[in-house]
A protein has these predicted regions:
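A secondary-structure boundary/capping signal
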Residues: 31, 60-61, 86, 107
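Residue-level signature for short turns and capping positions that connect secondary-structure elements
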Residues: 35, 50, 64-65, 90, ...
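Beta-rich strand-turn-strand
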Residues: 85-121, 125-127
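N-terminal targeting/trafficking signals and adjacent low-complexity tails
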Residues: 155-156
Length: 156
């Protein structure tokens, strides 16, 4: 059976601010109105981060807009949500977080075979000069692609 993946929210800022060392997939504990809201695309992970507390993983600052027809069943849009991973994986991540400068960030939220999943990244913060360097590389790559397009256009 083929898995259907629909990306709901991406955290592009995480790739700019951090070096992503490893990626993991985790489930997330949600209420029904939150799932409906996510299916409609009302989710933001721009400022979200992950905390490990007593062997459990929690995502903080993940904004899910209230479902418009949810009335009293709607929850706080910024509430703390539990991530679902195996204990062994959580212990492994917890030990890696003890290293200096490592953190866990949310990279994306997506639907996989009808279930809401979160892509978690083990990340190391970039310095300002690293950010400038990555911007320069991106600009250089864009200029090269434009030059190739321009030359191919005039060949015809």
């Amino acid at each position: 059976m083929k898995e259907h993946i629909k990306i709901i929210a991406n955290n592009k800022k995480a790739y700019f601010d951090y070096f992503i060392l490893e990626k993991f997939e985790a489930g997330i504990e949600l209420f029904g109105t939150e799932v409906k809201s996510i299916r409609m695309g009302y989710c933001s992970v721009k400022e979200s981060f992950i905390k490990i507390d007593k062997g459990q993983m929690y995502v903080l600052n993940m904004h899910i807009n209230p479902y418009e027809r949810g009335n009293i069943f709607n929850k706080d849009p910024l509430r703390v949500r539990k991530l679902l991973m195996h204990k062994l994986e959580i212990r492994k991540l917890s030990s890696k977080l003890q290293e200096k400068g490592l953190t866990l960030v949310v990279l994306s939220v997506y639907l996989k075979s009808g279930l809401v999943k979160v892509e978690v990244g083990l990340a190391k913060g970039k310095k300002n000069y690293d950010k400038r360097e990555s911007l320069a590389k991106k600009d250089q790559k864009r200029e090269i692609e434009n030059e190739i397009k321009r030359r191919n256009f005039y060949k015809l």
